[in-house]
């Protein structure tokens, strides 16, 4: 994300993957998240990462569990799951994008999707089942609260963690939490055992 942005491709759109990996390595990073410019096949991605002495530390998966069944989502995640397992990624950054305003500059943040109590309960059951599945696959689900999505605020994030199985872990994004006027330190204190990945 420091070199190019999948939500806004015009940010760093002309930055090559090689420049991104080279500069990340030179800066002292030993791991990097996948992005839109990264190869989607392990036989292509692994040599590219090795060339710059980098490991795959995670990457974004945009889910549609609000509209898909768990089995449908399991089928859709298979290619990325295989890629991440082949690359020995420690987790998968997982976010709900159904109805999200991402990629649509004409939509206001205030129009983001929201769930009523009935839908929330069903969603927590689905995400718990998905968390257990990915845990069994050795690829923990690290849920990313994100601006413009159904899980955006501190309240959304707390409610998600309080109502889902412990297999649903957390990607704490301090920038998104600040933007949503939430308290990252409180999340860290209250849910430290669920936190496995961070964006700062």
Sequence positions of predicted segments:
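Short beta->alpha connector loops
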Residues: 35-40, 148-149, 175-178, 182-183
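Short, surface-exposed basic-aromatic patches at helix termini and helix-loop junctions that form
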Residues: 46-53, 158-165, 188-192
């Amino acid at each position: 994300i420091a070199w190019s942005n999948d939500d806004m491709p015009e940010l760093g759109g002309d930055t090559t993957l090689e420049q991104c990996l080279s500069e990340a390595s030179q800066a002292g990073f030993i791991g990097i998240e996948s992005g839109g410019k990264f190869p989607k096949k392990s036989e292509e991605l692994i040599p590219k990462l090795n060339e710059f002495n980098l490991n795959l530390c995670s990457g974004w998966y945009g889910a549609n569990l609000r509209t898909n069944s768990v089995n449908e989502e399991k089928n859709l995640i298979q290619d990325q799951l295989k890629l991440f397992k082949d690359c020995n990624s420690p987790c998968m950054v997982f976010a709900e994008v159904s109805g999200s305003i991402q990629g649509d500059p004409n939509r206001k943040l205030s129009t983001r999707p929201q769930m009523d109590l009935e839908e929330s309960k069903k969603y927590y059951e689905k995400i718990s089942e998905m968390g257990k599945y990915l845990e069994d696959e050795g690829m923990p689900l690290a849920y990313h609260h994100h601006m413009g999505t159904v899980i955006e605020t501190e309240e959304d994030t707390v409610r998600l963690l309080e109502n889902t199985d412990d297999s649903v872990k957390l990607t704490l994004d301090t920038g998104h939490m600040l933007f949503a006027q939430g308290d990252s330190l409180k999340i860290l204190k209250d849910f430290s055992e669920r936190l496995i990945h961070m964006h700062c």
